[in-house]
């Protein structure tokens, strides 16, 4: 589901904050030994694409961060190499100065989650989402060098996780796979105060943190245009209030928090095609829901 993975990643870290294992506003140096290389960066910076590290664009293959796309090695080793690399020193900025979407900052976020919990990313996903919400299809891998061509849907996957090799270095910003009904369950969790059935997956405070326009509050930032904000894993349409987490392969999940509904558009194509179709559906879906 490519970048529709991001809200899932943010939720894992907010769950750890709910459990008292992580403070998303504290320097990650408090959580990992190698965090002192960039002592001002916090998990909140990472999850809002505001860490100052190099984002996914304009160069997805940015040399110092290339391990994010490789299934070899571990998430810990990859994140440490990213965070401590001297080869990005001329390119990075202080945190909360600019919005740099995606990229290796999400690997760092996942490694911090592993470190404070003492669990692997796979174990965290299982405990946070799979078990309480029954979303058995959800897992992460690192498919980018295994199949497909970057931002085009990897048709070789064919909805079969066995086509991927096992990895201890999943791609966090874009490596999740999940069926549409299971993703829908997680959207419902966001609309039901963090509940999956009787299980409290995330607190309402955690959800509010993810859904709020952090970049506006922190540094009067915008995400590609004055009308677009970003929370933690969620794009925010500042005019309508709609939040979304679209992916490169055509998935577009969105929530209307005011009206209390969500939708999940799934096509196996490109982000441009997915977003174009979603833009045609937003008002149609909204009118249908509000018509009762």
Set out the residue ranges of the language-model regions.
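Active-site SXXK
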Residues: 1-25, 106-114, 183, 260
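Structural recognition of the beta-strand scaffold that forms the well-ordered cores
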Residues: 2, 8, 45-48, 100, ...
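Hydrophobic "lid"/C-terminal helical patch
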Residues: 13, 186-187, 285
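Short, glycine/proline-biased beta-turn/loop segments that scaffold the active-site neighborhood
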Residues: 23-38
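Short, surface-exposed loop or secondary-structure junction motifs
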Residues: 39-245
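Short, surface-exposed beta-strand/loop micro-motifs that present aromatic residues
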Residues: 175, 249-259
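Short, gly/Ser/Thr-rich active-site loops of penicillin-recognizing serine hydrolases
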Residues: 215, 219, 272-292
């Amino acid at each position: 589901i490519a970048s529709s993975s991001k809200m899932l990643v943010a939720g894992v870290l907010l769950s750890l904050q709910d459990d008292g294992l992580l403070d998303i506003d504290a320097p990650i140096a408090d959580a990992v030994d190698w965090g002192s290389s960039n002592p001002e960066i916090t998990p909140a910076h990472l999850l809002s694409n505001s860490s100052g590290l190099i984002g996914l664009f304009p160069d997805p293959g940015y040399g110092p961060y290339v391990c994010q796309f490789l299934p070899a090695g571990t998430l810990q080793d990859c994140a440490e190499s990213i965070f401590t690399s001297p080869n990005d020193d001329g390119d990075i900025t202080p945190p909360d100065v600019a919005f740099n979407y995606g990229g290796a900052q999400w690997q760092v976020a996942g490694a911090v989650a592993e470190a404070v919990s003492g669990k692997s990313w796979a174990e965290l996903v299982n405990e946070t989402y799979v078990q309480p919400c029954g979303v058995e299809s959800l897992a992460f891998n690192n498919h980018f060098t295994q199949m497909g061509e970057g931002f085009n849907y990897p048709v070789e996957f064919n909805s079969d996780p066995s086509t991927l090799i096992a990895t201890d270095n999943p791609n966090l910003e874009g490596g999740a796979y999940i069926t549409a009904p299971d993703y829908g369950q997680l959207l419902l969790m966001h609309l039901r105060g963090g509940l999956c059935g009787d299980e409290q997956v995330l607190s309402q405070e955690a959800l509010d943190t993810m859904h709020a326009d952090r970049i506006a509050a922190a540094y009067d930032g915008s995400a590609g245009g004055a009308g677009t904000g970003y929370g933690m894993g969620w794009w925010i349409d500042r005019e309508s209030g709609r939040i979304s987490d679209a992916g490169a392969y055509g998935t577009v999940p969105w929530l209307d928090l005011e009206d209390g509904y969500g939708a999940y558009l799934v096509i196996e194509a490109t982000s441009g095609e997915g977003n174009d179709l979603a833009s045609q559906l937003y008002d149609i879906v909204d009118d249908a829901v509000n018509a009762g």
